[in-house]
């Protein structure tokens, strides 16, 4: 039941954001009584925290399992949508999310290429910012720059390539 609630909340938060989603909406999507959502997760902020951490853990599990890139990309996109919408809705994401396995994994990959911890962390932050920027503004960027017909897989590959370059010392 908790998994169904988390899945339903993640879908709704990705679609319209936590601010526009009520506990009753989540309960209806999960086909449970709204009292169960409160009993299992508490208030909406606590539910947002649970969803953020669950999405991060799920993405990490997919990566650890060697799941195919398209499936990882779908999960990553949803995680970033939930994260972005929660941030835009004013939720204190940095306080609510307690585990950042994808960011830690990226930092661990970047760290050996740098002379010190600060430059490794900054390079990782730049790469994450690029990914978040595309996540938030993809429709605008495609239109403004004239990339409406670029296939999704080509865009994703280009983003990952640029993230790799941003991660290098310069």
Residue ranges and their predicted role:
Residues 1-4, 8-46:
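Helix-turn-helix
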Residues 44, 51, 55, 79, ...:
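Hydrophobic/aromatic residues within well-ordered alpha-helical segments
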Residues 46-74:
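Amphipathic alpha-helical linker/stalk segments
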Residues 60-63, 91-122:
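Amphipathic alpha-helical packing segments from all-alpha helical-bundle domains
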Residues 77, 81, 121-125:
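Non-catalytic, well-ordered alpha-helical scaffold segments
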Residues 78, 84, 91-92:
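Internal, conserved structured core segments that host functional sites
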Residues 83-87, 127, 131:
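Short alpha-helical scaffolding segments that buttress acidic/His motifs in well-ordered protein cores
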Residues 104-112, 136-170:
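C-terminal peripheral helix-coil segments that are non-catalytic and often amphipathic
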